[in-house]
C-alpha cells in the first residue's frame, strides 16, 4: 500500500511501509515522517514552483534524511545531499533512482523503493505550446520521446506527469505520449496550476479513467493499493 499526499502543484509526499519520499516541495504542509522511516527529498530542478531551500529545515526535524537534487540547483556542501545529473543511476541500500534529461530544466526521476516503481517527471513533458517556433517545438518533442524510450522497460506503479492547462488544446500530449511508450498502473496528473478541471477534461476526452488518480485539493490523501 502506498499513501500519497498531494501537497501543491507538483509536490507529493509518498509513504511506503519503510520509507517516505518528498518530491518538488516549495510550499504547503508536509506530513510527519513516522518514527523509524527514512526520508528522501527530491527536487527535479531549480524553478521556484519545484524547489525551495525550506526543504533543508527537515534536517533539523528528522535524523534520517537524504536529499536527491538535480545538479542545476545551487550546491551546498553537505553529506546528506546528492546532486544528480541526467542519465545516471543513484542507489544505496534502500533505493535506486534513475534520472532523465528534462526538455525544460533539470531531470525527471524513476524511483525503485520497497518493491514499488514510481516516476516523477518534474518538468519533462511535451511542451507543445500553441504558436511557438516550430524548430523549438520539434526539438523538445524529440527529446521527450527519446527520454520516454529509456523508460519503456520499467513496470511503473504510479507516474506523476504534468497536465498543464496553459498548453490549451495540447494539454494532454505529455501523458498520452507517455502512455504510448511506457507501462504504468496509475497516473497522477500534476502541474495543473490549481485548475483541476483539466483532469476531468482529460478523462472525458482521452479516457484512462481507471488509471487516473485525481488529486484536486491540497492536503488530499489517497491510499493506493498496488
PLM region descriptions:
Residues 1-33, 107-132:
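Conserved beta-strand hairpin/beta-sheet module of binuclear metal-dependent hydrolase folds
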Residues 4-9, 78-92, 103-105, 171-226:
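Binuclear metal-ion centers of metallo-dependent hydrolases, dominated by the metallo-beta-lactamase
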Residues 10, 25-27, 45-46, 72, ...:
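Active-site metal-binding loops of divalent metal-dependent hydrolases
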Residues 14, 24, 45, 97, ...:
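Divalent metal-coordination and catalytic microenvironments
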Residues 19-21, 40, 66, 116-118, ...:
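Structural motif
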Residues 27-74, 149-160:
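Active-site metal-binding motif and surrounding structural segment of the metallo-beta-lactamase
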Residues 61-88, 95:
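Glycine/small-residue-rich loop that forms an oxyanion/phosphate-binding "nest" at active or ligand-binding sites
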Residues 103-180:
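Active-site-proximal loop/helix segments of hydrolase catalytic cores
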